[in-house]
Regions:
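Charged, alpha-helix-forming regions
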Residues: 1-279, 286-292, 307, 311-339
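Short, mixed-charge amphipathic alpha-helical segments
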Residues: 291-300
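Intrinsically disordered, low-complexity Ser/Thr/Pro-enriched regulatory regions
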Residues: 303-304
Length: 339
């Protein structure tokens, strides 16, 4: 009789000198207190340090020098630990036969010696140990990429893609805007409009992940009526040439890397073609009109605003000069939706 296939557990995966393992349940984390880039890096290092006994009821010890990175002060370590203690992960579970949500702290009790070259002793909460023990999906994070990414949004997006990249028959995932804000750790009251979220968080994160990781990533808006309510995250593995380019970027200086990314973004902005789905909404405007809009209203998605204009104009009399009408609408739109 054929044996059933063995379920591969996250705990079976082993970290290496170049990479570390993060259970998938700890990637899409909803933060009560927004975490910083340093917090996220430190937490990944704490998980790696505890990995061999991470599902056991034991304490773990790590040298603070391993958590400081290039920062010379221990103050940041203590602040990061406290924020991690207040962060939670929400996991969908079944309780007494009913769907339920389990909420678990990311980090348990700990003690930190005050010496700059001292130690941090910490615990993994019992409920979290159980979640990790039962985990079957994980992200393998390249250490070099983790330390090269310059924003918490980029690191979070990288983890999201690494968690999903090896899933069979799946190359996209959908989130509400609120879900995405929660996972990215956007502070409450910040980046509340789609245009702000896209410009300040999503686009820079996508650009960094595309530049430095093994995957190409896209985040596309999905509208309900006239509002963007969801996004679709898409990913695909780079070919050999693309992976080689990412490795060369990682080997280059950060200053040069940032400059090349900005140049690539500027070139993409100038050459970005009109999406095909807009053809169904009306004929293309003059090329000079799009260029004028790009120069007058930098940072806005020109074609998204065109779609908004066409939806608004659909119930009105056709303008005599569509190009002038679009630019007038764009001016009003920018005033009402500042970046």
């Amino acid at each position: 009789m054929t044996k059933p296939p063995r379920t591969y557990r996250t705990l079976d995966a082993r970290p290496s000198g170049d990479s570390l393992i993060k259970p998938g349940e700890l990637v899409d984390v909803v933060e009560v207190t927004p975490l910083t880039l340093a917090d996220r890096r430190i937490y990944n290092l704490l998980l790696e340090n505890a990995w061999d006994a991470i599902d056991k009821p034991v304490t773990h010890v790590i040298a603070k020098t391993l958590l400081r990175g290039s920062h010379n002060s221990n103050d940041r370590i203590g602040a990061s630990v406290e924020r991690l203690m207040s962060a939670i992960v929400k996991v969908e579970v079944v309780w007494d036969g009913e769907p339920a949500i389990e909420r678990v702290q990311l980090l348990g009790g700990n003690i930190e010696t005050l010496r700059s070259d001292g130690l941090l002793e910490y615990e993994i909460p019992s409920r979290l140990r159980k979640i990790i023990r039962n985990s079957t999906v994980f992200a393998r994070l390249q250490r070099e990429v983790m330390f090269a990414l310059t924003s918490k949004y980029a690191l979070t997006l990288y983890e999201m893609v690494q968690k999903r990249g090896n899933l069979r028959w799946r190359a996209s995932d959908r989130f509400t805007l609120e879900e995405l804000r929660g996972i990215l750790g956007v502070p409450k009251g910040k980046l509340t409009s789609w245009s702000n979220l896209k410009l300040r968080a999503i686009e820079p994160a996508v650009a960094e992940v595309n530049q430095l990781s093994d995957y190409v990533v896209e985040i596309a808006p999905i509208k309900t009526g006239r509002r963007v309510t969801h996004v679709e995250l898409r990913w695909w593995k780079k070919d050999g040439e693309g992976q080689g380019a990412a490795e060369r970027e990682l080997a280059s200086s950060r200053v040069g890397r940032e400059q090349r990314r900005k140049e690539a973004e500027a070139e993409a902005d100038g050459l970005k073609p009109r999406p095909a789905w807009l053809d169904a909404k009306g004929a293309s405007l003059q090329t000079t009109t799009y260029e004028t809009a790009r120069l007058r209203f930098p940072g806005y998605d020109i074609y998204f605003v065109e779609a908004e204009w066409r939806a608004w104009a659909a119930t009105r009399e056709a303008p005599r000069d569509a190009d002038a009408a679009f630019l007038a609408f764009f001016r009003t739109y920018a005033e009402r939706h500042p970046l």
